[in-house]
């Protein structure tokens, strides 16, 4: 995989910048955490070289200064709101987040239940936290929030909320999902800290959009594609332009809320040290791009991947036409079509040539490998074999998995397990290669050669990380998961298997 991002530089300058921001205030900073922390695969795809856990590793350098506060909305607890990606309720996710942080030796100080209005489920949740020895606090709804600044920044507004006791200079405020009340919790703490004579600060830690890249830079367009279902829009920050006569990129929701946020901070302190929403951020990721061309290509690939992801959801019955149309519009901004990815064209051509569903992969050196569906193998499984054989310099005509082994597996799938598709999936191919790679001294010469070839093929799997793949048919969840684990950028035509 070609590298376009200096991860070590990021770990260094991002942690230093956060320290500088803490020092600007009375040694106390409340930092609202946006985006993914544990597994930011989007960032790792558009910025090759960025590790999915880079932000967590960066915060690890500040571990002794960090205290984490997890925020959850009482209304979400009452409604049993579920995280779609994890299929767990928000209250369960509070425990998951706490366990994740603590397993990495971060201090989790407490849980704040926002929008509390006597909800029974919230009371039960709080009792559970108490039994487990976890501190909890409640924050109440405020009439006219966020516009009634006079009430909000008073003892009848933020002053009614529990004061969250913290002991470390950097308080990271995170939550199971949007709408939990992270920003309001930070501002409430600023008000209550100020009453106690501490001039604490507020900052936002979000990765995208990248403020110091051009508005139409592919990295920023890829962020819009990733949030097309939310209809987020990247914009030039007008407040930053007015204050400094410099362009900076932000997104519509932060720009829209800034006048309100500005008024609230002025209501607490009498003045706001930030002139723009961009000022509030601490993101240094744009300074760590080491090869812009690599990141531009990766981001364009990601825009196309998001398009196919959206069209696949539509093929499965989702009502997401607006999401698909939004990404089509982003194609124009990025000046690309699906043909930008050579694998897309190669897979189509293979399908036209053979009359079968097909797949293609682009290896790191630019070589394109293709495969088609056969009575024995699905196109994705065949592609995995063809690619690893090429990388291992095994003759293309050499059969790694004998038909005599495949046919009994197919019989089991159809006759005993009631399946409809006899072809082997990618996971079954990998298991077969693993079994066949085992060799002992009693093996016949032909078996020994087969075992050696299977071993050599398996050893090539790490070389597939970062490679782009396209198939002309929607793959099963099993195949999708295998390619995800291998680190491949997979797209599929919105065509369901018959």
Each model region followed by its residue ranges:
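Phosphate-handling active-site elements
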Residues: 196-200, 393-399
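Substrate-recognition/cap regions that form aromatic- and gly/pro-loop-enriched pockets
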Residues: 395-407, 411-428
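Flexible phosphate-sensing "switch/lid" loops adjacent to ATP/NTP-binding sites
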Residues: 1-172, 189-348, 356, 363-365, ...
């Amino acid at each position: 995989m070609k590298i376009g991002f200096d991860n070590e530089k990021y770990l260094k300058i991002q942690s230093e910048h956060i320290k500088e921001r803490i020092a600007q205030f009375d040694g106390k900073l409340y930092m609202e955490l946006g985006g993914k922390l544990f597994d930011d695969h989007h960032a790792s795809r558009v910025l090759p070289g960025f590790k999915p856990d880079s932000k967590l590793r960066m915060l690890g350098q500040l571990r002794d200064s960090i205290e984490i506060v997890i925020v959850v909305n009482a209304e979400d607890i009452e409604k049993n709101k579920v995280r779609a990606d994890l299929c767990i309720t928000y209250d369960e996710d509070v425990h998951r987040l706490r366990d994740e942080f603590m397993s990495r030796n971060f201090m989790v100080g407490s849980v704040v239940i926002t929008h509390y209005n006597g909800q029974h489920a919230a009371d039960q949740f709080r009792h559970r936290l108490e039994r487990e020895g976890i501190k909890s606090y409640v924050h109440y709804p405020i009439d006219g929030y966020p516009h009634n600044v006079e009430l909000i920044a008073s003892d009848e507004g933020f002053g009614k909320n529990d004061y969250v006791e913290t002991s470390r200079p950097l308080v990271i405020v995170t939550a199971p999902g949007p709408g939990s009340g992270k920003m309001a919790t930070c501002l409430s703490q600023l008000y209550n800290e100020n009453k106690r004579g501490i001039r604490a600060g507020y900052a936002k830690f979000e990765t995208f959009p990248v403020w110091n890249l051009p508005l139409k830079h592919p990295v920023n367009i890829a962020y819009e594609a990733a949030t097309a279902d939310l209809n987020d829009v990247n914009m030039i920050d007008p407040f930053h332009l007015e204050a400094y006569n410099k362009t900076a990129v932000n997104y519509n929701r932060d720009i829209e809320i800034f006048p309100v946020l500005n008024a609230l901070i002025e209501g607490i302190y009498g003045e706001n040290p930030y002139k723009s929403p961009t000022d509030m951020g601490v993101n240094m990721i744009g300074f760590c791009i080491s090869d812009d061309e690599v990141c531009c290509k990766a981001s364009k690939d990601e825009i196309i991947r998001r398009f196919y992801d959206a069209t696949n959801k539509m093929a499965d019955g989702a009502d997401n036409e607006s999401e698909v149309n939004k990404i089509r519009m982003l194609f124009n901004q990025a000046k690309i079509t699906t043909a930008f990815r050579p694998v897309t064209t190669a897979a189509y051509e293979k399908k036209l040539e053979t009359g079968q569903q097909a797949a293609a992969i682009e290896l790191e050196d630019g070589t394109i490998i293709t495969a088609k569906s056969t009575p024995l193998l699905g196109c994705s499984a065949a592609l995995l074999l063809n690619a690893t054989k090429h990388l291992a310099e095994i003759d293309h005509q050499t059969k790694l998995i004998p038909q005599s082994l495949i046919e009994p597996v197919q019989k089991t799938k159809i006759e005993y397990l009631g399946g409809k598709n006899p072809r082997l999936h990618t996971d079954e191919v990998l298991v077969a290669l693993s079994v066949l790679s085992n060799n002992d001294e009693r093996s016949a010469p032909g078996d020994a050669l087969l075992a050696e070839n299977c071993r050599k093929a398996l050893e090539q799997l790490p070389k597939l990380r970062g490679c782009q793949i396209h198939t002309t048919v929607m793959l099963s969840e099993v195949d999708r998961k295998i390619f995800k684990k291998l680190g491949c950028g997979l797209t599929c035509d919105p065509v369901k298997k018959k």
